[in-house]
């Protein structure tokens, strides 16, 4: 094992050295990414990017906490919020497709300080999330190989993810396409088997009516509250986490071959498929598994996944191993997407002067290679979990908890300003290549809901023995304002008047 690991390390060092040399010889004149993502890549990245551990593992906790219909209500509410956010992002992304996405939009349509803070917030979010996912990869593989040190699996996963992102954006898109296809296939298979079980064709008799109505007619804890973690409000956070990653669609617009066609196509079809997948999956779980079933609680492994429970009840004895492989696919996909998103955000910040210019350099394949190395350096935090164990892993998860919601808030504010500026400058809204739904109601509702969910992230963590975890989680909020105010005072920026907003369609 020591010899093979040494060989792997040497190969990685040689690979990195070659890429750095290649980058140095080509990047002096290259500062552009390449539009190589096809429509099918964009659609599948948007679809598969949100189907992951949130659905496969934590959905059981949501059903147990809020009840069958409470869980469905929570996912519908969050789904509606995300729908409005993504149509807002879709309108801006088709008008100005850029790798900086909402960071660029915040800079152009709100205030350069706002875009600066959004960009660094999002880069940090995904860079840390990559470290979390690499740790999760090790946990998945230890399901089969419990005696092998975890850091070896994390290292192998890091090398794979780094290599995919270092080759070309087309390689990234193709990899995500097939990883997403695996997840979608499992969900479709789950729904087919689930409904066959509900109708009594497989798995024997199931008392669906009882499972769905027990305990306050399917609502446990009623409306609930953010602080107690019960009821519908108490699970909105978990439901929100499940949908995080949908905003990746905006970042892929910067490298899509034909964003004016591929982005609207993805927006018009993908969101509803995601929502249907989630709602139908939650319904099947709740119909087959009583919310009082202890197996639904604390689902942090494939063996406790609601998918595993359903598969086992219809006779799939190796369901746990199958679902562990699927979860492994999900976390590798998440790490891959996270590496891509954070690299492109750092690249975009550098292009706009918000980060050192060296991060804007690209290889001949259009890869922001120095930005990729910087993101990989942060991802190395995963190896500290081998030293400090579960406690450090928990802190990493907490650190990335709020940043995704802050990005959503930024999308809503940026779009509201974009549309108002568009009208203020006498432009015809009908000529926009894509229209967000129900403006201004949509972004305003999404903004209010996102702020409520963000501020309601289990504030009780700040008290008692969990105060460190609470402080780390809520640190994202003051960090955002430090970045925002620091840039604002240094560069004397102000809220851009609507008639002075830059509505040109050429970014680079």
Swiss-Prot record:
Q: Where in the cell is it found?
A: Cell membrane
Q: Which GO terms describe its cellular component?
A: plasma membrane
| Regions crossing the membrane | 43-63, 66-86, 112-132, 144-164, 184-204, 219-239, 270-290, 314-334, 367-387, 393-413, 436-456, 467-487
GO function terms (MF aspect): amino acid transmembrane transporter activity
Assigned protein family: Belongs to the amino acid-polyamine-organocation (APC) superfamily. Amino acid transporter (AAT) (TC 2.A.3.1) family.
Which PANTHER family would you find in this protein's record? AMINO ACID PERMEASE, GENERAL AMINO-ACID PERMEASE GAP1
Task: Specify the protein name.
Answer: Lysine-specific permease LysP
Write down the species. Lactococcus lactis subsp. cremoris (strain MG1363)
């Amino acid at each position: 094992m020591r010899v093979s690991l040494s060989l792997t390390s040497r190969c990685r060092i040689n690979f990195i050295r070659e890429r750095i040399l290649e980058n140095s010889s080509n990047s002096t004149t290259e500062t552009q990414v390449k539009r190589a993502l096809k429509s099918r890549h964009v659609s599948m990245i948007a679809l598969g990017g949100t189907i992951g551990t949130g659905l496969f593992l934590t959905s059981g906790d949501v059903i147990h906490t809020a009840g069958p219909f409470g869980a469905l209500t929570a996912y519908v509410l969050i789904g509606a919020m995300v729908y409005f956010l993504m149509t807002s992002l879709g309108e801006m992304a088709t008008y100005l497709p850029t790798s900086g996405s909402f960071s660029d939009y915040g800079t152009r349509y709100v205030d350069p300080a706002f875009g600066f803070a959004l960009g660094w917030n999002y880069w940090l979010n995904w860079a840390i999330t990559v470290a979390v996912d690499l740790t999760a990869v090790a946990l998945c593989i230890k399901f089969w190989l419990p005696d092998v040190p975890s850091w070896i699996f994390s290292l192998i996963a890091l090398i794979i993810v780094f290599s995919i992102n270092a080759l070309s954006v087309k390689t990234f898109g193709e990899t995500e396409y097939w990883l997403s296809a695996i997840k979608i296939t499992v969900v479709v298979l789950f729904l087919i088997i689930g409904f066959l079980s509900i109708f009594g064709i497989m798995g024997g008799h199931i008392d669906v009516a009882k499972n769905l109505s027990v305990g306050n007619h399917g609502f446990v804890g009623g409306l609930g509250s953010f602080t107690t973690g019960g009821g519908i409000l108490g699970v909105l956070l978990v439901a929100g986490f499940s949908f995080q990653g949908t905003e990746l669609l905006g970042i892929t617009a910067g490298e899509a071959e034909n964003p004016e066609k591929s982005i609207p196509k993805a927006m018009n079809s993908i969101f509803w498929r995601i929502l249907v997948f989630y709602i139908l999956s939650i319904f099947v779980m709740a119909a087959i598994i009583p919310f009082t079933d202890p197996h639904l609680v604390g689902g942090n492994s494939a063996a406790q996944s609601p998918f595993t429970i359903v598969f086992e009840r219809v006779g799939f004895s190796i369901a746990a191993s199958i679902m562990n492989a699927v979860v492994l696919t999900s976390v590798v996909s998440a790490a891959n997407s996270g590496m891509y998103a954070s690299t492109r955000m750092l690249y975009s910040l550098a292009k706009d002067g918000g980060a050192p210019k060296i991060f804007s350099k690209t290889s001949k394949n259009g890869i922001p290679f120095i930005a990729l190395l910087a993101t990989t350096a942060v991802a190395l935090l995963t190896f500290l979990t081998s030293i400090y164990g579960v406690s450090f892993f928990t802190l990493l998860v907490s650190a990335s908890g709020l940043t995704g919601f802050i990005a959503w808030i930024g999308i809503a504010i940026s779009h509201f300003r974009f549309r108002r500026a568009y009208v203020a400058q006498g432009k015809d809204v009908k000529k926009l290549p894509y229209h967000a739904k129900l403006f201004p109601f949509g972004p305003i509702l999404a903004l209010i809901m996102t702020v409520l969910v963000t501020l309601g992230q289990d504030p009780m963590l700040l008290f008692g023995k969990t105060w460190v975890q609470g402080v780390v989680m809520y640190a994202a909020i003051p960090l955002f304002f430090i970045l925002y105010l620091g840039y604002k005072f240094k560069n004397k920026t102000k809220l851009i008047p609507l008639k002075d907003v830059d509505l040109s369609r050429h970014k680079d």
